[in-house]
């Protein structure tokens, strides 16, 4: 990071957090700022892939909420570095609630090449992933493919696959997400739902 800064190369700091290091979040933010990062992205672990092995280390719901509220206050005051909690779609619910309580407009900033920053989960809505075998997935955390580009066109998969169509239809969502007034700005993490409930609409 210091070499990047020395040579005028912009860089981003990505950090992943679980129970074992959640207390370090403010310190990591401060370090990224001191290093001169263009952006700091706080990744909240999604329990898929290797993340399944540390399911018991996921941050509790209560602590998660406190961290997102801390991020909201920090982001309001942060002028030099772009910041965003990644794979934490309910942050956008926190932003709306807090800004409404305070009677203030929240200015969201993002990188010029970023796909996110305006709403919660965009998997299968604005982005997707094509793996080395041609499988088309909603995001890098979501293990269920919507189709394969070796068998059908990407356009057909993107527009017509059952998986993508369901992800875009909030009326099909179940459980707390399905009845939440903030579903349109949050959407919940579908990969997290699939991992925990076995149903990406739950």
Listing of model-derived features with the role each one plays in the protein:
Residues 135-136, 140-202:
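Flexible mid-to-C-terminal extensions adjoining Fe-S/redox cofactors in radical SAM and related proteins
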